[in-house]
Amino acid sequence: MALFKLGSVVATPGALQFCEQHKINPLLLLGRHMAGDWGDLSPHDVAANAHAIQHELRVFSSYKFGDDKVWVITEADRSSTCILLPDEY
């Protein structure tokens, strides 16, 4: 069940290449993100996301794959969601 809207979904070239190389389906990451499975976040960041959903603030997920991470960020106004690598932020 979706907790919030994603808006327009975009992905950086680096994130798409990483997902392709590691056989990661970006749609599964989006599904986890909007269902409240925010991956590898601290308890503080999990609480911040819960607050963000209630108060229409930015929602952030971080999924770890070995030593690498893929981030998913939904903007506060829910106009867009971006899949990216941390060094592309």
Residue ranges and their predicted role:
Residues 56-89:
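Short, compact, well-ordered microdomains
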